[in-house]
Curated annotation (Swiss-Prot):
Record's protein name: Flagellar P-ring protein
Summary of the function given for this chain in its UniProt record: Assembles around the rod to form the L-ring and probably protects the motor/basal body from shearing forces during rotation.
Biological processes annotated in GO: bacterial-type flagellum-dependent cell motility
GO molecular function, one term: structural molecule activity
Assembly description: The basal body constitutes a major portion of the flagellar organelle and consists of four rings (L,P,S, and M) mounted on a central rod.
Amino acid sequence: MTLSKWILSFGLSVCLIVSHPVSAERIKDLANIQGVRANQLIGYGLVVGLDGTGDQTQQTPFTVQSILSMLGQLGVNLPPGTNLQLRNVASVMVTATLPAFAKPGQQIDVTVSSMGNAKSLRGGTLLMTPLKGIDNQVYAVAQGSLVIGGAGASSAGSSVQINHLGAGRISAGAIVERAVPTVLGQGEYINLELRDTDFTTARRIVDTINSRFSYGTATALDGRVIQLRAPLNNNQRVTFISQIEDLDVIPAQGIAKVIINARTGSVVMNQMVTLESSAVAHGNLSVIINTQPIVSQPGPFAQRGETVVVPQSQIEVRSEEGNLMLLPGSASLADVVKALNAIGATPQDLLAILQALKASGSLRAELEII
């Protein structure tokens, strides 16, 4: 494989973060206000109106039980032992995210996912479904027509499907019924929480806030939490938080890190990765096993005998020579890529090479395998 072809193939499997000067970011993009958070909601419901693509009720007894319970609440009582054969109903799980400061009457999006063996939820309508929080209290009620991003068709045993048919969304499909109390800090203090723990970034945020307001306004409690002295009046506190979020801070550069996905062979490096001078020899080892059955029959005039099939295997081991190659020290990400391309290894082989370079101390980066 030529160097140009290797660079092309390596580029398809290795995602690189291009080195750019670090620019200032808003504090809003680096930290969150402690206590201002979303909450997850979940509920169990029924989707009706499907075109024969719903649950097979004989295999999903919980669907039948849910239908009988719903009909009973609506005043429809079926005789005991009634065998329902329905194909236009599906049991689903409904999930939603309740944003911070959401008030009763506001609408939120919901995601509807099939729970049974329904083939498709396309064209279905979700019936009224209460959505509960972790405390088992109802915070929203969902209902509406599903929007499915996939499509499919089947006939005479053949089928075709595009994207996924077992899940969909309802935009503004739930109405908030209960608000979650959110308190902006305790007393005169509120806390900022950095999204990534970093002492340098925390110090820079503190210095920026104190220079904008007054010394003592911000105090770093640790590498993640910054305490702010804020006004007690709600309106003034909101204005204060807004001004804090719009301040620009240059975040600290992260540690050198190489992310390896062992399943796909993908490798991601950040701009801090460097490489010390090292020598690498890499050879491919392949084992080829070829098995052929050989039939052994008795002679034409033998009185007794049986035909026997004996497998005959041939095992061949091939080892390609790997020349020792010098990798010069690299101070930039582009130089690291150029040095790794010079080895000529496949992306899967590159995983082993990076681990060996890290073990030898030549790769100045933290390896993380996902």
